[in-house]
A protein has these predicted regions:
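A generic local secondary-structure boundary/capping motif
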Residues: 79-81, 103-107, 131-134, 152-154, ...
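Short alpha-helices
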Residues: 118-186
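Hydrophobic helix-and-loop "lid/oligomerization" segment in the mid-to-C-terminal part
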Residues: 2-32, 40-69, 84-87, 168-329
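A glycine- and small-aliphatic-rich helix-loop capping segment at beta-alpha/alpha-beta transitions
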Residues: 48, 106-114, 150, 181
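Short glycine/serine/threonine-rich phosphate/pyrophosphate-binding segments
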Residues: 36-42, 98-102
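Generic detector of well-ordered alpha-helical packing
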Residues: 32, 36-38, 95, 120, ...
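Short, glycine/charged-enriched secondary-structure capping and boundary segments
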Residues: 41-44, 72-74, 104-108, 130-133, ...
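Active-site cofactor/cluster-binding pocket
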Residues: 72-74, 80-130
């Protein structure tokens, strides 16, 4: 394609649909530490394309976490160091920054005829040949549902389960303010197509090993709240971070659950850097905080990675959070 295509409406345009009009070889490319929104959408689209005689490769810089092993087709998603062969289309979902592919995006642009970027983050870099970015979507799973409907895909229980899980997790089990009537309408259609909410919830929240509860207790003992009660945080050293990345990310919701807290932070020491997850309650834009450290996200949910040891990173991030909270308190 000569010039990048941009589309922001909830329903995909003809230009978004065009790369999927004929069969070929496709790459479903994920980002670092893939979560349920990226995995669910890539798997759903890949399964739909395979039903139309496409050859599909699934993978990214990191493998799928054990917590999401129940997703249909996830066993085919693998860690990729390099890309082999050519692709008619390369699809990235829920990935606002191409740097999150750890260099695989550069290989993809060389190996793929068309790079399709589908995302709901408002700060998406528009790095694809086709860029469909809809910040009004609660999850990229909503957008993928619309794409499959526009392509006249018959939803299977496997596809429906992947998309339902994507939406379920990105809305905090339908608890967050990003949930709309559209969210529930799509979720209902996915349940009608064979997704089972009780099995998704059980797989995500009720299959812990006994020692996981002990680890959870140790982690929660580290929760701190500022003197004024408006900032809550949890700083985890590398020795305390489990392999189940998705589950540990949910820890940020514990300080967020404190009534007085306006911004909650989870800081996890990983590979010599600190991964930061930020959550707000609507009155402080945590995306702006994350942007100060090269990150991004949404108004109420954002993240970034900060260099340096955990104590120093915690101090720097909390200072930025306090400034944001104080500005809001005086505005």
């Amino acid at each position: 394609m000569s010039a990048p295509i941009e589309h922001t409406d909830p329903v995909p345009s003809a230009a978004v649909l065009e790369p999927f009009g004929r069969s070929g070889r496709a790459l479903m490319l994920g980002h670092v530490h893939p979560d349920a929104d990226v995995l669910g959408t890539l798997l759903a689209l890949g399964l739909a394309l395979e039903a139309r005689d496409w050859s599909v490769v699934y993978g990214g810089p990191h493998p799928a976490p054990a917590l999401l092993a129940f997703l249909p087709g996830v066993d085919r998603y693998r860690r990729l160091d390099k890309l082999d062969g050519r692709f008619d289309v390369v699809v990235l979902t829920d990935c606002p920054n191409p740097q999150r592919t750890e260099g695989l995006i550069d290989q993809a642009k060389s190996a793929g005829k068309v790079v399709v970027n589908i995302d709901h983050h408002p700060d998406n870099r528009r790095y694809g040949d086709v860029n469909w970015v809809d910040p009004t979507a609660a999850a990229t799973g909503e957008m993928m549902y619309e794409l499959l409907m526009a392509l006249r895909v018959a939803l299977t229980p496997a596809i429906a389960t992947n998309l339902f899980t994507a939406i379920h997790t990105d809305t905090g089990s339908f608890r967050y303010s990003n949930v709309t009537t559209r969210t529930f309408t799509i979720a209902a259609a996915l349940v009608a197509a064979g997704a089972r909410p009780e099995l998704v919830s059980e797989s995500l929240y009720e299959r812990r090993a006994p020692d996981a509860l002990h680890w959870l207790g140790e982690a929660l003992a580290r929760v701190e709240v500022s003197e004024d009660g408006r900032v809550g945080w949890l700083a985890l050293p590398a020795s305390a971070v489990p392999e189940r990345i998705v589950e540990s990310e949910e820890l940020v919701n514990y300080p967020r659950s404190v009534a007085s807290v306006r911004v909650a932070c989870l800081l996890r020491e990983l590979d010599g850097s600190v991964k930061v997850s930020l959550r707000g309650k609507g009155d402080v834009d945590v995306q702006r905080i994350a942007a100060q450290f090269g990150g991004g996200g949404h108004v109420n949910a954002a993240g970034c990675t900060v260099a340096g040891p955990l104590p120093e990173a915690t101090q720097v991030v909390l200072a930025a959070v306090r400034r944001a909270v104080d500005r809001k308190g005086t505005s």
